[in-house]
Amino acid sequence: MRLIPFKIESVTETLTEIPYGVKHIEAPKLWKNGEKGEGIVIAVLDTGIDRNHPDLVENIIDGRNFTDEGSEDDYSDRNGHGTHVAGTIAAFENGKGVVGVAPEAKLLICKVLDRNGSGSYQSIIEGIRYATNWVGSKGERVRVLNMSLGGEKDDELEAAILEACAKGIVVAVASGNEGDDDEKTLEYGYPAGYNECITVAACDENKKLAYFSNNSLQVDCIAAGVNVNSTYLNGQYAKLSGTSMATPHIAGALALIIGLGEKQ
């Protein structure tokens, strides 16, 4: 199992903006009504996170490393992908840098991929089950799970996803970047191919389907995935492209929807 290939467009040390993808899904409208994902825990199964990033440190609730890279408690990101995904979901609103879709949600970091973006199916399955059964110090439970990764079909992986769904966790996954810019071609990957998942394709700033985005009957929704600004390694920011970047927009949106529903 590997990261779905992505492209680094640029890296910068300073930035202040609400990324266009966050605006696309109209998250700021919910913020104005007081819904920012407070109390909602989102599990991020990826390459880890920059634990000291100023836009993320406030929202990391817990984490664990399931790779061979360091100790169980070392879920630091040595790739950049996981940090970028986490920022799109829940970068803290601190007046600088970027802000995520659900800026008051909490992040449970499950490092299942190493610095090269590789991980075993067993590591990913263990990460899913850890997130499914995790309980916070105040009784918090995971409500949303984000996986911006892909590989071959695996029955045990699907079983773990089914276990998560049975406990009320919504699973958002990337559709994949094997698209050929032909709407008639259908590209399939996994876990995107499982019916239990919300599968996310990518669009650009003009809301046009990205040329690289997988297009299949399993795609449920589309979100920004081209030149997406978010958090990156060493406290920096980066523009990345890929369906990996689209998926966390939906994970964050799900947190807002869940929070809103619980208040009504």
Predicted regions and their residues:
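Glycine-centered tight turns that cap/initiate beta-strands
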Residues: D55, N59, E196-T199, N227
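Hydrolase catalytic cores
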Residues: A86-I89, L108-D114, W134, G225-Q264
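Substrate-binding/access-modulating region of protease and related hydrolase catalytic domains
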Residues: V112-N195, N206-L209, N215, L233-P248
